[in-house]
Amino acid sequence: MPINVPDGLPAAEILTKEDVFIMEEKRAEHQDIRPLSIVILNLMPNKIITETQILRLLGNSPLQVDITLLYPETHRSKNTPEEYLIKYYQTFDSIKDQKFDGMIITGAPIEQMPFEEVDFWPELQKIMDWSKANVFSTLFICWGAQAGLYHFFGVPKYPLPAKMFGVFPHTLNRRDIRLLRGFDDIFYVPHSRHTEVRKEDIVKVPELEILSESEESGVYLVGTKGGRQIFVTGHSEYDPYTLKAEYDRDISYELPINVPQNYYPGDDPRQTPVVRWRGHSNLLFANWLNYYVYQETPYNLEELGNR
């Protein structure tokens, strides 16, 4: 089934060439089925790359999805032109009176800053609080997951001695959770971060449950009971060459960076990267969309405030 995006969105052309079913607004107006409404709060600097990665995964679902793109109005973007944001994105003030089946809050390359020093932190707090009554299920990614765990549950983040950078094996802590349905016993996920949340802090919070972790990269999937909030510390949405682009960028700036682990054959950056996470990423987003949004959300979204 298609995902509905704003007319003319550049990601639509890219994904159409990949045979992802994209439906622009004009065509979607003639559909009789109520699509799922998903709002994506895109905090990444290069919004086009991130929105394309996420839409690719949402478009692999058999469900029809209506997309709203959101950006923090209190942050001035240096990497995405303002006219692009005006054309394709909404601000919180423009959507705060709406309700959504699902929400995705992306990561941001600011994990070394204290949360309170992030210029859009007050706005993000307001959006996260709003989501509790206006969104059925929210998926938090990487820094977004750290921000959500800190804001709602007081879970701190800690600096790492070296950047967690590479593709790491993960295992399941539960097998009877719908989000994990179909996951392999061992599956791989990219990570790219300078900070971490720790198991000993999360297990102290009765509302939270660690669903998956890694001996190398730590806690990966955390959920609230019932799945209204899902926290993902890795980047399963990454394209095959995203880690390469980050590595090449840091090398060009002469920044201290290790070769991403388990990514290049023989850890040799002259080789073509090996993708080990594509199946997992599609399953994670499909399960969230199906089991935690589509099958649970009320048909009348105005009922959300009562749940």
From Swiss-Prot:
CDD domains per the UniProt record, alphabetical: GATase1_HTS
Pathway entry: Amino-acid biosynthesis; L-methionine biosynthesis via de novo pathway; O-acetyl-L-homoserine from L-homoserine: step 1/1
Residues annotated as site: Important for acyl-CoA specificity: 111
Residues annotated for substrate binding in this entry: 163, 192, 249
GO CC term (a single one): cytoplasm
Entries under Gene3D superfamilies matching the protein: 3.40.50.880
Keywords from the UniProt entry: Acyltransferase, Amino-acid biosynthesis, Cytoplasm, Methionine biosynthesis, Transferase
GO MF, one example: homoserine O-acetyltransferase activity
Residues under site feature: Important for substrate specificity: 192
One GO BP: L-methionine biosynthetic process from homoserine via O-succinyl-L-homoserine and cystathionine
Subcellular location: Cytoplasm
SUPFAM superfamilies for this protein: Class I glutamine amidotransferase-like
Chief location category: cytoplasm
Pfam families attached to this UniProt entry: HTS
InterPro entries in UniProt: Class_I_gatase-like, HST_MetA, MetA_family
EC annotation from Swiss-Prot or TrEMBL: 2.3.1.31
Domain of life, per lineage: Bacteria
Family: Belongs to the MetA family.
Role: Transfers an acetyl group from acetyl-CoA to L-homoserine, forming acetyl-L-homoserine.
Entry protein name: Homoserine O-acetyltransferase
UniProt source species: Desulfitobacterium hafniense (strain DSM 10664 / DCB-2)
